[in-house]
């Protein structure tokens, strides 16, 4: 026994470090909360978009990791002086560039608890609460959205929390692929065709590449301004018939509720009718706008989802849940499981073999998974359906107000209908005296975008709709209020005025010289 005791003492002396001592964790945890609270108190004062140049951080950080420990105080000082200057502040109330990554006290605290527990909930046995809470909150959320019962666990379907929409689309596409190939034969993968619009998020194209779909069989159907950039059911059916005539196999349709470029909503009832006629898997991507559909006045945009096979939205976008949390519901979980399940010996257990539990490892690409359900549960309980609806309505109201400001200024025009909390607008051709060429109008709008973003006062982004360069003004930040919207519009007006004056002066000079 003596030799074992000596070995125990020796090993104990070799590992003196306790990296999770409760009282030190408490002390440092308070420091971190204080740091973040101070950050949020002054986040509005930072330039919204980072002003650094590529490679700035490598120039100011050491070439190798420290040999000796450093204090949290020292590390946080470096965060303040070295990291924050290189952050684009997504939580700034003046961030209007992309769909929000909305945060909240409840979301942060749920994330903290999830990270603190640090469980790896790949199946029911390794953390029953992680699995069962996810079952519950996805059913809760599904009921809030009035999803068909067939998408809920209580109706034979079910929900799963993925990291992002990219993962959700890939999982459903793989499930659709394998279901089809079991019917038509594995050697027909080169004949499978995926359909979407030219407004569909690029996540689908990436998923199709990963899933082995021939790039020649990816159909991004053209949309038009006259139809508000919706996917046209007649064009979809025409594309399907053309592919069938050429011996191809229509596989998968992705319809969108709230496109990234303009937030348009594809006509789900007509599209699903066409898709079901030809036995396509239908996925509805509502990454951004899906959250709004908990409000009765927006639920209409999900009409037709009852004919879809899967549906997803990002709670981390407009639902106060913090990145990452994508909710995916499927009508037939067995389709996912057949494609994504693995059951090596070291994962076998009695609970799984009863087939009475959900093993979420078989609903996703990865094996390991985080306890995401905690933060969604915290958000749902902390704010309730009523306050969550008002949060969304507040942003929609601000967008409506901004739209009114744009319409009152004769130099600008709204380019696409505003449905939710984003406005697509531009300096219109008539504001540019003697310059009605579309390329020149696009260029002045590009310069406006660069000018306001370089100022650091606000951050906006752009898209191109039907050849028109458009500025996107997306409202959704947790800290944004009507005063920030008004101030942002003043920034845009001032910069537009300066650019138009310069353009007018340049044109006059050209006239004189000619």
Curated annotation (Swiss-Prot):
GO BP term, pick one: carboxylic acid metabolic process
- Quote the EC number: 4.1.1.108, 4.1.1.107
Q: Which reaction does it catalyse?
A: L-tyrosine + O2 + H2O + H(+) = (4-hydroxyphenyl)acetaldehyde + H2O2 + NH4(+) + CO2; L-dopa + O2 + H2O + H(+) = 3,4-dihydroxyphenylacetaldehyde + H2O2 + NH4(+) + CO2
Among Gene3D superfamilies, the record links this protein to: Aspartate Aminotransferase, domain 1, dopa decarboxylase, N-terminal domain, Type I PLP-dependent aspartate aminotransferase-like (Major domain)
- Provide GO CC annotations from the record: cytoplasm
UniProt keyword list: Decarboxylase, Lyase, Pyridoxal phosphate
PANTHER family hit by this protein: GROUP II PYRIDOXAL-5-PHOSPHATE DECARBOXYLASE, TYROSINE DECARBOXYLASE
Its protein name is 4-hydroxyphenylacetaldehyde synthase
Which gene underlies this protein? AAS
């Amino acid at each position: 026994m003596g030799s074992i005791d000596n070995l125990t003492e020796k090993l104990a002396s070799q590992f003196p470090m306790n990296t999770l001592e409760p009282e030190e964790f408490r002390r440092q945890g308070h420091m971190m909360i204080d740091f973040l609270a101070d950050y949020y108190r002054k986040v509005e004062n930072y330039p919204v978009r980072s002003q650094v140049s590529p490679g700035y951080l490598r120039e100011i950080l050491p070439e190798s990791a420290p040999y000796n420990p450093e204090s949290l105080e020292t590390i946080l000082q470096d965060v303040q002086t070295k990291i924050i200057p290189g952050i684009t502040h997504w939580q700034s109330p003046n961030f209007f560039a992309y769909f929000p990554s909305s945060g909240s006290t409840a979301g942060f605290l749920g994330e903290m608890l999830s990270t603190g527990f640090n469980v790896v909930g790949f199946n029911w046995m390794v953390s029953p609460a992680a699995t069962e809470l996810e079952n519950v909150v996805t059913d809760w959320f599904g009921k809030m959205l009035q999803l068909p019962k067939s998408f809920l666990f209580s109706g034979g379907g079910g929900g799963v929390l993925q990291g992002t929409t990219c993962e959700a689309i890939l999982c459903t596409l793989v499930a659709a692929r394998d279901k089809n190939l079991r019917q038509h034969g594995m050697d027909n993968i080169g004949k499978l065709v995926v359909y979407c619009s030219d407004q569909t998020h690029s996540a689908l194209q990436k998923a199709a590449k990963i899933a082995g779909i021939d790039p020649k069989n990816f159909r991004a159907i053209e949309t038009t301004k006259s139809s508000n950039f919706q996917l046209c059911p007649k064009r979809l059916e025409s594309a399907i018939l053309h592919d069938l005539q050429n011996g191809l196999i229509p596989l998968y349709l992705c319809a969108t509720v709230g496109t990234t470029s303009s937030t348009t909503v594809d006509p789900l009832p007509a599209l699903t009718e066409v898709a079901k006629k030809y036995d396509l898997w239908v996925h509805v991507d509502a990454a951004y706008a899906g959250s709004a559909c908990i409000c009765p006045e927006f639920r209409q945009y999900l009409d037709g989802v009852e004919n879809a096979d899967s549906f997803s939205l990002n709670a981390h976008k407009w639902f106060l849940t913090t990145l990452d949390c994508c909710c995916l519901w499927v009508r037939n979980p067995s389709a996912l499981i057949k494609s994504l399940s693995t059951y090596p010996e070291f994962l076998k257990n009695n609970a799984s073999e009863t087939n009475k539990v959900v093993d979420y490892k078989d609903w996703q690409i990865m094996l390991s998974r985080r306890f995401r359900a905690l933060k969604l549960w915290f958000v749902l309980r902390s704010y309730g359906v009523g306050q969550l609806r008002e949060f969304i309505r507040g942003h929609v109201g601000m967008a409506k107000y901004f739209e009114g400001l744009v319409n009152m200024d004769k130099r600008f025009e709204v380019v696409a209908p505003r449905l939710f909390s984003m406005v697509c607008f531009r300096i219109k051709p008539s504001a540019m005296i003697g310059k009605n060429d579309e390329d020149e109008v696009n260029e002045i709008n590009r310069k406006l975008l660069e000018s306001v973003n370089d100022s650091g006062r606000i951050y906006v982004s752009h898209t191109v709709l039907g050849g028109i360069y458009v500025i996107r003004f997306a409202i959704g930040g947790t800290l944004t209020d009507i005063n920030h919207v008004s101030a942002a519009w003043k920034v845009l007006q001032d910069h537009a005025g300066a650019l138009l004056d310069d353009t007018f002066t340049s044109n006059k000079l050209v006239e004189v010289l000619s």
